[in-house]
Structures are given as C-alpha cells and as structure tokens.
Amino acid sequence: SSAASDVYKRQANGWFGPTTRKNLRQQPALRQGSSGTWVFLAQIGLRFNGHRTVSLSGKFDGDIVREVQNFQRRAALHVSGLCDYTTWCEIIASNGDTDRVLKGLDTNVFITASEAKQMRAAGYTHVGRYLVGPGQKYIRAQEFKNISDAGLRLFPIYQRSNDSLESMSYSLGYEQGLEALVRGRVLGLPFGAVIYFAVDFDPVGDEISGPVAAYFKGVKSALESVPSSRSYRAGVYGTRNVCGVLRSLGLVH
C-alpha cells in the first residue's frame, strides 16, 4: 500500500509506519461504486484476513460491502461497510488504528476503586489484569471487587515470560497451565472463566503451528486434567494471526 499511496517505490520498505498512515488517512473512504487499485488492495487485504471468497475484481460492489461489514463486526469496529482509515489500519496491522476509541485495556498495577470508576466513566468496559508476576503486576483479591463494583468486566491474563519461541513448549505450557489453575482458584476466579495466556511476540507460520501450538496443547491438557466444573478454559492474548491459528486448531476459546 505504501507504493500506491504516493510514497516513492524506493521508500517502500514493507513497514506500516507513520508515513504510510499519514498518506492513508488522506485517502477517501472506499464505498459501493468505487473501483481501481485501492479497491484491489482492500480485496487482497480482506483475503489475507480470512475472507477467502472475496473477488479480486477491483470493484467495490455489494458483496464487498458485506465482507467489509463482516470484518468490521469481527474486529469490533463501527459497522459501516465503508473501507475508511480505521478499517484500512485494522486490515493491515494487528494494532489497527492506534487513535481509535477503545473499550478495553490491560495494566500491570493495582486498580483502586477510584481508578476503576474513572476507567468506566472514560468508556472502558473490560480490563485485563495478570494472574502472576512480580510486585504489583499480579491481581489481588480486592481488585475483583473494585473492578466489579465499577461495572467493569475482568479478563485474566497469564504471563511468566512468554516472549520468545524458547518460552513455548508443551512441558512449559502444562506447567504454566497448572499454575494458572491454582492461581485462579486462590483468587476465587469463577470456574469456567477464560484465562488468556500471553504470546508476547510476533511468531508467524510454522512458529505458530509448531512451538506456540505445542505450548497451548500443554496448557489445554493441564486445564483438562481436572473436571471442567472445577477448572478454567484457555484463551490467547496475542496478535490477530496467533489468535486465529490457535482457534482454528481448537486450542483456545
């Protein structure tokens, strides 16, 4: 998209950086009736994001409108059917439009009752806290009440390191799955809740289907080593690609 947005080809480096974002923001939104290179790029992007039946016609017809709406719905964006700046960013990069209004956040510090209320007043609905970690990183029992009383929903995150392929294996997944199970029980996390295990780096291809998948097989085995009525379900906290592959393998909810 860099080359198509008046960035000279010698400047196009494959990075979706500030120059590309600036040029992309100046492009008019694609809508039904649009045609040309930008539509073709949008169609390729939708295919890359799992919309395999999208045509590569370069024409923004009713079928493309519906595919864009489905993509926006899945990405929790405003459903307009327009391929606007925010939608473009979501198609191209996992972090999407970094200036968009968000509904969720995560933090590695204790959330007071006052802070929880401020988060809710700011429009947040979900907050992520860590089950393990040094210092204030891990959640305390009192925070459950602070979060709940403010009308927020908690999504629990498990992360020891989980930041490289070396930290991804079946044995580590099993060990950490058991730790998450114990930690959830100690904190009083409702049984059946999803614990989101972090993949804090950007693996691709065989790295996801290999070591990362092996780690989550270990996590799943650990959580399923006790009756489901006394356990939790595995989720993943990572890039869109990682989440999609692991879900397609049946390893996460």
Give the label of every model feature segment:
Residues 3-8:
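Short, small-residue-biased leader/transition segments that mark boundaries at the very start
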Residues 12-32:
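Feature responds to low-complexity, polar/acidic, surface-exposed segments characteristic
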Residues 29, 34, 74-75, 80-122, ...:
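Boundary/entry segment of secreted carbohydrate-active catalytic domains
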Residues 38, 45, 102-106, 125-130, ...:
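Structural recognition of the beta-strand scaffold that forms the well-ordered cores
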Residues 107-110, 131-134, 159-162, 200-202, ...:
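Active-site beta-loop-alpha junctions enriched in small/polar residues
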Residues 135-211:
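Substrate-binding cleft of extracellular glycoside hydrolase catalytic domains
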Residues 182-189, 202-253:
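Surface-exposed substrate-engagement region within the catalytic domains
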